[in-house]
A protein has these predicted regions:
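Flexible inter-domain linker/hinge segments
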Residues: 1, 84-85, 89-161
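CN hydrolase (nitrilase-like) catalytic-core segments centered on the catalytic cysteine
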Residues: 2-85
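Active-site adenylate/phosphate-handling loop in enzymes that bind or generate adenylated species
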Residues: 4-12, 190, 225, 249-298
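Secondary-structure transition/capping motifs at alpha-helix termini
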Residues: 40-41, 72, 160-167, 188-200, ...
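A conserved beta-strand->alpha-helix junction
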Residues: 84-86, 115-133, 195, 199-255, ...
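Glycine- and acidic
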Residues: 131-145, 164-173, 202-204, 248-254, ...
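A phosphate-binding catalytic loop at a beta-strand-loop-alpha-helix junction
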Residues: 149, 153-194
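Short glycine/threonine-rich loop-to-helix capping motif typified by GTGT followed
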Residues: 173-186, 213-217, 245, 294-297
Length: 298
């Protein structure tokens, strides 16, 4: 279809002026086709069908207008009603998704572009934007998604542990969400390998900002999962380091924060060396996107 050529040349919104006549069940096929094409091309797809005034011959047109984005139908008109539908297409998100792929060009040689002017008007947002797009609303779907995420991560870690012949896994537990998830994944990987949870070296490393709540959470979690609990305070070591480099401990700047992160990483690495283990990272994609990491500081 022409839409493929346009998308390959960088078009992120396809407008299809169509005259598709009506037969029984064709509306479902049409919606699947439009939604599927928008997913394949990573684009917004506006399908504008002919209405009831198009022809007096032996065919009928229903004005079945559809707006889709990356596989999702945003709006569709009621057939035979000559309705106007409108919605918003998240072009920036589509562009971001395309940058992760090498299929789509900015423009290929020989492709004709026709410039035009369009007045931009401020309008009210009609489309619902989910503040948590990766979290299903249904409890059943949410549990299935969480189990799937844990299984994917656990299988990846299982393969890595097998490949490196590591005898243990070493993980820093803060009591926060990231390290909690990493520990749960590690436990599942060990279960898949049939390894004792005591070979998981779960280390708490209290620092200047550690609260009783996060510390208690960490200890309770480790004991509940029957991992090997270890505690190493970083306060004395970090104070010595600050003295060596002339850092005032009262100045809570990036050096203050990273000094603690680096000390924790050193401890975990040394324990891993001592036990023939692997350090399990607790960073997440948000950290990666923002350019900083729990691992060894920024």
């Amino acid at each position: 279809p022409p839409s493929i050529r346009h998308a390959l040349n960088g078009a992120n919104v396809i407008v299809n002026l169509s005259a598709s006549d009506e037969t029984t069940g064709k509306d479902i096929y049409r919606e699947e086709l439009v939604g599927g094409q928008s997913a394949r091309l990573l684009c917004g797809y506006i399908y504008a069908s002919a209405g009831d005034g198009e022809s007096t011959q032996d065919v009928v047109y229903s004005a079945h207008n559809i707006i889709a984005e990356n596989g999702r139908i945003l709006k569709k008109a009621k057939r035979f009603a000559n309705e106007t539908v409108y919605s918003e297409i998240d072009v920036l998100r589509l562009n971001a998704e395309r940058r992760r792929m090498t299929t789509f060009e900015t423009r290929m040689d020989g492709y004709t572009e026709i410039p035009f002017a369009l007045k931009i008007e401020e309008t009210e947002l009609t489309r619902y934007i989910d503040p948590m797009p990766f979290v299903p609303g249904s409890k059943t779907d949410r549990e299935r998604r969480c189990d799937e995420i844990l299984s994917i991560q656990a299988m990846g870690l299982k393969k890595r542990l097998e490949h490196t012949h590591c005898k243990s896994a070493v993980i820093g537990i803060s009591g926060g969400l990231d390290s909690t998830l990493a520990l749960l994944v590690t436990v599942r990987a060990f279960d898949l390998l049939g390894m004792d949870h005591k070979n998981i070296k779960a280390v708490t490393m209290p620092g200047f900002g550690t609260t009783d709540r996060t510390y208690d959470n960490a200890v309770s979690l480790i004991k509940c999962l029957n991992a090997d609990f270890m505690e190493v305070s970083i306060r004395d070591a970090v104070n010595i380091h600050f003295r060596d480099i002339g850092q005032d401990p009262k100045v809570h700047d990036v050096t203050y924060e990273n000094g603690q992160a680096r000390e924790r990483t050193q401890i975990l690495m040394d324990i891993a060396n001592k036990t023939g283990g692997m350090v399990i990272g607790t960073g997440d994609l948000s950290e990666l996107a923002l350019g900083w990491a729990t691992y060894n500081g920024d």
